[in-house]
Design a protein with these regions (language model features):
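Fe-S-dependent hydro-lyases/dehydratases of central metabolism
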Residues: 1-201
Length: 201
């Protein structure tokens, strides 16, 4: 109760306290309207986080960047280099890596891990995948690093954590990891194949 009173006093002091009556008196300097039907999923990259690519155009954009000059944020590959494939042997398995092979999948401590509906959605998706007999590819390094212990608490209480773990999304810690380059090393055979084959992966 003391904390509630403190929060109320603070929000009133800084002008953030809202009641239905007060809301009627609020005047905004600007109104923004957004047609939600125009919002579409997107990815960042392939080189800079500020380069937004609509999800439906990712394949086309990635292929175009492979041959673009490096000074134009491309990878400068020749047409011959585009077909490059590398055979990898890891633990009793053999597989091929090519340009664009996804080798890291991480659920990390960005804004999304503070959103229970998104995280529970990830857990439900993992549950469906496991129940359907699906698994990650053997060359993909996976990890789970939410920004708060609350996330693992509700994933465990909901019974969804075992399904994420079954797909390799084990808890590696709380806080920034893969997104800032703290993914740790790739499995040696995968790293060596990408390096030797000069793959964009």
């Amino acid at each position: 109760e003391e904390l509630v009173e403190l929060v109320e006093a603070y929000t009133k002091a800084v002008g953030l306290f809202r009641t239905p009556e007060a809301e009627e008196k609020v005047q905004y300097s600007e109104y923004l309207e957004l047609d939600l039907s125009t919002v579409e999923p997107s990815l960042a990259g392939p080189k800079r986080p500020q380069d937004r690519v609509p999800l439906k155009e990712v394949k086309k954009s990635f292929l175009a960047h492979l041959t673009k000059p490096v000074k134009e944020r491309g990878f400068g590959l020749s047409e011959d280099q585009l077909q490059r494939k590398v055979l990898v042997k890891r633990r009793d398995e053999e597989f091929e890596l090519t340009h664009g092979s996804v080798v890291i999948a991480a659920i990390t401590s960005c804004t999304n891990t503070s959103n229970p509906s998104v995280m529970l959605g990830a857990g439900l998706l993992a549950k469906k995948a496991v129940e359907a007999g699906l698994d990650r590819k053997p060359w993909v390094k996976t990890s789970l690093a939410p920004g708060s212990k609350v996330v693992t608490d509700y994933l465990e209480m909901s019974g969804l954590m075992p399904f994420l773990e079954a797909l390799g999304f084990h808890l590696v810690g709380y806080g920034c990891t893969t997104c800032i380059g703290n993914s740790g090393p790739l499995p040696e055979p995968v790293h060596d194949a990408i390096t030797a084959g000069k793959l964009v992966a």
